[in-house]
């Protein structure tokens, strides 16, 4: 077991009870690209080359962690999002591909000189991606987690963008001073506590619950708070952008 071909077969065998074949292939590709710095072409052309023992041992260790439920992004400590690289730790949600759609949507409206607020910024992936997309914009991210704020600040430096990240609680905005914004964007907690049973263990066991869940009796808690905040801190022609729970699409619009 000393080539890419052999290691991929090993991963397929070890992880088949937890992941689909396609997911395992994608995970293997991520490891080869992140650790060996191979391209897609390298992976194909060099699949039968003898690998260094240090990488083989590292790969086996990664598979064991994956088998225990740890997400690959936390294992490697980084992930890709919107063409950028982000440090990824259990202090913030793992950036999801579907959130890139939100970034693209907001990016169509964001202009140089605009002030943008990212509520519940987590790793900073939304705000940082938008700051990179429109470098003349003034981007601020807020979160209630000190660890997430520190992670977002590190990611801003990593990606060479100017964005500030502040410890703030949108449910109690009166406890801090705020600017007035042209755009407010948020991917807030929106999964009801009762929906936990439908979620994968690797999400429930490893990602921060305060960034995922809302009470069953108040699923629009954060959307309502942000909408009310916008009444006093959004310019008259300002815009709100959200990632939402599809089960409450119409109710969210009604706010």
Question: What residue spans do the PLM features occupy?
Answer:
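Class I S-adenosylmethionine-dependent transferase superfamily signal
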Residues: 106, 130, 203, 226, ...
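Conserved AdoMet
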Residues: 32-105, 109
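Short clusters of hydrophobic/aromatic residues that line enzyme substrate/ligand-binding pockets
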Residues: 43, 51, 76, 170, ...
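Non-catalytic accessory regions of SAM-dependent methyltransferases
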Residues: 1-44, 48-49
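Conserved SAM/SAH cofactor-binding pocket of Class I
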Residues: 98-198, 247
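Conserved hydrophobic residues forming the short capping helix/wall of the S-adenosyl-L-methionine
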Residues: 15, 156, 230
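Mobile active-site "lid"/loop adjacent to the S-adenosyl-L-methionine
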Residues: 190-222
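Conserved Class I SAM-dependent methyltransferase catalytic core
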Residues: 216-255
